[in-house]
Amino acid sequence: MRKSGILLHIASLPNKYGIGTMGREAYNFVDWLRSAGQSLWQILPLSQTSFGDSPYQSFSIYAGNPYFISLETLEEEGLLKHNEYADINWCKDPRYIDYATMYENFYKVMRLAFGRFSKAMNGNVSEEYKAFVAENPWLENYTLFMALKDAHGGKSWCEWETLLRLRDVTAVYSAKKKYAKDMEFYAFLQFEFFRQWYKLKKYANDNGIQIIGDIPIYCALDSADVWCEPQLFQLDRDRVPTVVAGFPPDAFSEDGQLWGNPIYDWDRMKQENYRWWVGRMSFAKKLYDIVRIDHFIGFNSYYAILFGSKTAHGGEWHDGPKYDLFNVIKRETGKGGIIAEDLGIITPSVRKLLKQAAYPGMKVLQFAFDPTGKSEYLPQNYTSQNCVVYTSTHDSDTALGWFNNLDRTTKQFVKEYLGVRHAAELPEAFIDIAWKSTADMAMTTMQELCGFGTEARINVPSTIGNNWRWRTLDSDFTAKSAAYLDRLTEISNRKPPVKKSRKKR
């Protein structure tokens, strides 16, 4: 069945309190998607972000981002008073997230909510909370990790005292006793996060909207995952990485990309029958309806750079687990529900892996306009319907911003191919050819629908600061744009069967 939808991260939803949340505006967006005839909502990783604010660098592969908890919902639950959060100036410009202000104020407000939550329990743990803790065994390690980070002034676990860094049994036991209340606070945050998330997901599903989630291939070094299971990563005896992940120099980057993530010990993971990955994918498939796996080609082969290197020069390619991993994942978690982000160097070996896995790959229109007309990303050259076409992604400029930075020859080719005369017509033309392509799924962004330029870009890869900040406003979700998309979706044979609308929370 042909489908289509919008890529819009939770953080980018409108909201008075600094960042998009799983509150009223998220439900309004589901309603807007339904009115626009859409069946897919794609988001970025829901993970708790670390100091760079990137959802692809998280303190845990399991923990949700507490910033997405709706403060208004907590007020409805009796855990907050309105003035306790409404009187705070969360941001200067509603178009952009101010992460410094969020960090300064959010956890203070949540401590107030936690205090009331703890008192309301009166020593008797609610059945819902008890069930949540029992169903999520990762919570204990994660909450201890966060409590210890607080105790160490936010420092990476790599800088903690030796006994805790190496997870000495006695030291860990003592820390759990000492920081029990702080661990409870972080467990409370996760309880509220997932409580709100699954209610929102159910509402979306009840209204015919599937959620496409996203998981990074690698963990951050400063994460509970690496701290707790160092044997699964290429670390030395002192838990220092021997090699880190990245990408070699190419036409787009003279020094390559130095991501800095520790690399998996794939031999050890295979010995454990990929237990860690099966657990991760099982969790992701519960969290989302469809899972996009970032940097899929890294499972075929990965680029390893010596730890401490300043650039990506001098790294080496090594074989990844290839289909062996995905064969186990399919057997243990089911066959479907995965999108492979297969952008990059597509070798015959990568093509073989994609064919074996049978996951849909990605086609990004901004890569399509080689003046020869032979690009595999150009819709006329698609050889399979088993793919997802994107007008742009979180790592690219908007269609308009991209076009404005092209050379004159390529601009002319784009105009001729799309049949447009002016740059302002480009975003709609991109959406049109994506929707009318043979790809099973077609995705665009709110930036494209609104015709925004580079000012609305979410992320510039390999740069630090000023990323992941852009947000929508209520005024962006117009009846006119919904009607346009609804009609295009209908004539493109992507419109889902009509379902009776479900009520909000």
Annotate the PLM regions:
Residues 1-11, 27:
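N-terminal regions that are enriched for targeting/export leaders
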Residues 483-495:
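C-terminal accessory segments of extracellular proteins
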